[in-house]
């Protein structure tokens, strides 16, 4: 198992191959990981992080992403690698970069930090909104997909009858797992009504439906000041 894949080269064809591989593995094989590339916002996918600063920061970003906890954001995380990178940009450049889906670094008091922990997804729509551009949100969703699959494989696959009692046991275990995620503040507002475990088309099939509210980190502060 692995959590992140990285390539810091400049070859556009190779980048596209990485993106296509990532999409196929995530969407068709159910293997949840992220790929980190340098300056490739064209990926436009929640599973691909495009580092818009220096290429030298790609592998650090991949390592930090792979090691991040389910309730952790890399926003404002200090870079502790060995490279010296010039990350001084105009405010307008940072704004443009974020809109393009670039993960950028900024410098504060001599320390390099992650501006916002985002991925390259920018094609927001009603069915898939801007929440999916947050790496913390994607981290939560990927963790749930991986962990529920592991629970099923370890305790239920070929071991439990696919009847009402067996499905209720699976539901109870998944619910307990989500309660732990709420304690970690990875998700919020989850109740037993937000999950259903049903029999699928075939006798051996089980289908799980969930409604999830991932928690994200504070990133923007808006203030209203009243002058009396």
Language-model features: where?
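Extracellular Cys-Trp
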Residues: 1-76
